[in-house]
Amino acid sequence: EVQGQGTACFIAAGLRLSPEDSDIVLQRLRAWQERRAATQPLEWPSCGSVFRNPPGDHAARLIEAAELKGLRYGDAEVSTQHANFIINRGAARAEEIEALVANVQQEVLNRFGIELQPEMRVIGEVADV
Protein backbone atom coordinates (compact mmCIF):
# COMPACT_ATOMS: atom_id res chain seq x y z
CA GLU A 1 0.00 0.00 0.00
CA VAL A 2 1.27 3.43 -0.96
CA GLN A 3 0.19 6.30 1.26
CA GLY A 4 0.60 10.03 1.07
CA GLN A 5 0.52 12.44 -1.79
CA GLY A 6 3.04 13.77 -4.20
CA THR A 7 4.86 12.58 -7.25
CA ALA A 8 6.40 9.39 -5.86
CA CYS A 9 6.40 6.41 -8.17
CA PHE A 10 7.75 2.87 -8.24
CA ILE A 11 10.87 2.32 -10.31
CA ALA A 12 11.58 -1.24 -9.23
CA ALA A 13 10.07 -4.06 -7.22
CA GLY A 14 11.41 -7.28 -5.79
CA LEU A 15 9.22 -10.37 -5.76
CA ARG A 16 9.64 -13.54 -3.79
CA LEU A 17 7.80 -16.36 -5.53
CA SER A 18 7.42 -20.01 -4.75
CA PRO A 19 6.47 -22.86 -7.08
CA GLU A 20 2.78 -23.73 -7.12
CA ASP A 21 0.68 -26.17 -9.08
CA SER A 22 -0.73 -24.33 -12.13
CA ASP A 23 -4.18 -25.90 -11.68
CA ILE A 24 -4.39 -24.48 -8.15
CA VAL A 25 -3.28 -21.05 -9.35
CA LEU A 26 -5.88 -21.08 -12.16
CA GLN A 27 -8.57 -22.16 -9.71
CA ARG A 28 -7.70 -19.22 -7.41
CA LEU A 29 -7.72 -16.79 -10.34
CA ARG A 30 -11.13 -18.00 -11.51
CA ALA A 31 -12.55 -17.68 -7.98
CA TRP A 32 -11.15 -14.14 -7.73
CA GLN A 33 -12.66 -13.21 -11.13
CA GLU A 34 -16.05 -14.64 -10.10
CA ARG A 35 -16.01 -12.59 -6.86
CA ARG A 36 -15.18 -9.44 -8.84
CA ALA A 37 -17.93 -10.10 -11.37
CA ALA A 38 -20.46 -10.63 -8.57
CA THR A 39 -19.58 -7.43 -6.70
CA GLN A 40 -18.32 -4.92 -9.27
CA PRO A 41 -19.94 -3.39 -12.38
CA LEU A 42 -17.49 -4.86 -14.87
CA GLU A 43 -19.84 -4.48 -17.84
CA TRP A 44 -19.42 -0.67 -17.81
CA PRO A 45 -16.27 1.45 -18.04
CA SER A 46 -15.18 2.93 -14.71
CA CYS A 47 -12.02 3.95 -12.88
CA GLY A 48 -12.61 1.44 -10.09
CA SER A 49 -13.18 2.55 -6.52
CA VAL A 50 -13.78 6.30 -6.47
CA PHE A 51 -13.34 7.04 -2.75
CA ARG A 52 -11.00 5.81 -0.02
CA ASN A 53 -12.66 4.04 2.88
CA PRO A 54 -12.80 6.38 5.88
CA PRO A 55 -11.48 5.00 9.18
CA GLY A 56 -13.88 2.43 10.59
CA ASP A 57 -16.34 2.51 7.71
CA HIS A 58 -16.75 1.84 3.99
CA ALA A 59 -17.30 4.51 1.37
CA ALA A 60 -19.75 2.26 -0.51
CA ARG A 61 -21.87 1.78 2.63
CA LEU A 62 -22.04 5.53 3.24
CA ILE A 63 -22.95 6.27 -0.39
CA GLU A 64 -25.64 3.60 -0.33
CA ALA A 65 -26.98 4.82 3.03
CA ALA A 66 -27.21 8.31 1.52
CA GLU A 67 -29.45 6.72 -1.17
CA LEU A 68 -27.17 7.78 -4.01
CA LYS A 69 -27.03 4.49 -5.94
CA GLY A 70 -28.27 5.13 -9.46
CA LEU A 71 -27.74 8.91 -9.26
CA ARG A 72 -26.85 10.15 -12.73
CA TYR A 73 -25.31 13.21 -14.29
CA GLY A 74 -25.60 12.70 -18.02
CA ASP A 75 -24.00 9.31 -18.71
CA ALA A 76 -22.05 9.25 -15.42
CA GLU A 77 -23.81 7.12 -12.81
CA VAL A 78 -23.23 5.88 -9.27
CA SER A 79 -23.34 2.12 -9.87
CA THR A 80 -26.39 0.30 -8.55
CA GLN A 81 -24.21 -2.78 -8.08
CA HIS A 82 -21.39 -1.18 -6.05
CA ALA A 83 -21.93 2.35 -4.75
CA ASN A 84 -18.21 3.22 -4.72
CA PHE A 85 -18.01 2.89 -8.50
CA ILE A 86 -18.99 5.62 -10.94
CA ILE A 87 -19.69 4.06 -14.29
CA ASN A 88 -19.81 5.51 -17.79
CA ARG A 89 -23.10 4.51 -19.40
CA GLY A 90 -22.07 5.73 -22.83
CA ALA A 91 -20.55 9.12 -23.42
CA ALA A 92 -19.99 10.59 -19.94
CA ARG A 93 -17.91 13.75 -20.02
CA ALA A 94 -15.25 14.57 -17.44
CA GLU A 95 -17.42 17.46 -16.21
CA GLU A 96 -20.30 15.07 -15.48
CA ILE A 97 -18.06 12.67 -13.58
CA GLU A 98 -16.48 15.53 -11.61
CA ALA A 99 -19.91 16.96 -10.75
CA LEU A 100 -21.16 13.55 -9.65
CA VAL A 101 -18.09 12.97 -7.47
CA ALA A 102 -18.56 16.40 -5.86
CA ASN A 103 -22.27 15.76 -5.28
CA VAL A 104 -21.62 12.38 -3.65
CA GLN A 105 -18.97 13.95 -1.40
CA GLN A 106 -21.32 16.77 -0.38
CA GLU A 107 -24.31 14.48 0.30
CA VAL A 108 -22.26 12.09 2.45
CA LEU A 109 -20.77 15.06 4.33
CA ASN A 110 -24.24 16.57 4.89
CA ARG A 111 -25.81 13.32 6.09
CA PHE A 112 -22.98 11.72 8.07
CA GLY A 113 -20.38 14.43 8.68
CA ILE A 114 -17.76 12.35 6.84
CA GLU A 115 -15.66 13.85 4.07
CA LEU A 116 -14.95 11.19 1.47
CA GLN A 117 -11.47 11.42 -0.05
CA PRO A 118 -11.03 10.47 -3.72
CA GLU A 119 -9.09 7.29 -4.45
CA MET A 120 -8.41 8.46 -8.00
CA ARG A 121 -6.20 11.32 -9.03
CA VAL A 122 -7.50 13.80 -11.58
CA ILE A 123 -4.85 14.84 -14.08
CA GLY A 124 -5.32 18.04 -16.03
CA GLU A 125 -7.68 20.93 -15.51
CA VAL A 126 -10.68 20.43 -13.30
CA ALA A 127 -13.81 22.01 -14.71
CA ASP A 128 -15.94 24.39 -12.67
CA VAL A 129 -18.75 22.31 -11.20
Predicted regions and their residues:
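Phosphate/pyrophosphate- and phosphate-bearing ligand-binding catalytic cores of soluble enzymes
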Residues: 1-99, 107-129
